[in-house]
Amino acid sequence: MRCKTLTAAAAVLLMLTAGCSTLERVVYRPDINQGNYLTANDVSKIRVGMTQQQVAYALGTPLMSDPFGTNTWFYVFRQQPGHEGVTQQTLTLTFNSSGVLTNIDNKPALSGN
């Protein structure tokens, strides 16, 4: 009888604590990287006054371009390391009607480490 009681108590205790895992970081979670991966060195290659072709050669194809034809390119990189928070890097490039780069907006700014 004592063995049955001990087994039942252990089973109940196991069920009650099953959702309270303190070993969350033991479970493998892969890093999820999406978009255009750019380093600070890549961003430093572009300058106001470059053409769209020069920018595309330096950085590659943008993830998105403005669908309304205002000549805006978006390079977005989103990273979610396994057990950490999500970070997002957005580089927005604006061109004039001649296809010349007029504005660079880098949020949050990449810093060379």
Curated annotation (Swiss-Prot):
Its main location: membrane. One of its GO terms (molecular function) is protein-macromolecule adaptor activity. One of its GO terms (cellular component) is Bam protein complex. It is found in: Cell outer membrane. GO terms for biological process: Gram-negative-bacterium-type cell outer membrane assembly; protein insertion into membrane; response to antibiotic. Keywords: Cell outer membrane, Lipoprotein, Membrane, Palmitate, Signal. InterPro entries: BamE, BamE-like, BamE_dom. Disulfide bonds: none annotated. Part of the Bam complex, which is composed of the outer membrane protein BamA, and four lipoproteins BamB, BamC, BamD and BamE. Forms a subcomplex with BamC and BamD. Monomer in the periplasm, but is able to adopt a dimeric conformation in the cytoplasm. The Bam complex has the shape of a hat, with the BamA beta-barrel crown in the outer membrane and the periplasmic brim formed by the BamA POTRA domains and the 4 lipoproteins. The intact Bam complex can have 2 BamE subunits. Belongs to the BamE family. PANTHER family: OUTER MEMBRANE PROTEIN ASSEMBLY FACTOR BAME (PTHR37482:SF1). This is Outer membrane protein assembly factor BamE. It comes from Escherichia coli (strain K12).
